[in-house]
Amino acid sequence: MDLARVLAQYDAEVRASPKAPPGLVVERADGVVCLTGYFNFISWWELTPSTVRQAVASHAAHFRSRGEKLMWRVYEHDSPAEISGCLAEEGFEPDAAGTLMIFDLANEVLATTGNVDIRRVKTEEHLEDFVKASEQAFGERDTWQRTAYSDRLNDPDLALYVAYVSAEIAASARLEIGSARSFGLLFGGGVAPSYRRLGIYRALVAERAREARRRDLLYLSTDARETSKPILQNLGFVSAAKEVTWVLNPS
């Protein structure tokens, strides 16, 4: 895999031209691409050292006036170099660092083992299990997911999964199809504490890889935390870029 080429393709297709699912809108202003709705997330920008400070200040003021949280994700290859400093000056705080990881679907998807039952979410009942699994894994209420996905259970560009162990909810995960249909985007994968170290995270990644292959996608991508990175590397993912998500909380 030509990692530099694939990373440039990811930037162009996923970050600069994001697909807005129901409930989100893509807004472009001042050289910045922002998804707004049930969350607010800046995915891309074309700024210079002379324009970055004003653009950051403008977006910070806008979302503060609305009393809404704003996330701005910066990768190590992004420019201008001043952007992280400008975000800090405007009151953004860095979340835990992560790594963009990419898997070439031309490679073999590793088999998984373990007594885990992975089911695709097709009904409202299973969506409730999906939300519960996320809440158990991350210890936070995730009611936004119910709103975001209840009308998308038959969306061909979305696949939600719940993992069960002995009929008990253990984990959940999500696959989204990028706008140019080259990338499958992996989200979630959180496992409830009592079911960790059983290979469930790995099984959910493998299941989504198989689904992505069935849809003739080229790559999988995910923003991984340090705890997930070794598992993904073992499955064949390659580290593409370090990242930090800067968060502006309403005050």
Question: Model-derived features: where do they sit?
Answer:
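A conserved beta-strand-loop-helix scaffold within acyl/acetyltransferase catalytic domains
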Residues: R141-P193
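A conserved beta-turn-beta hairpin within the catalytic core of GNAT-like acetyltransferases
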Residues: C34-S43, D95, I177-F187, R196
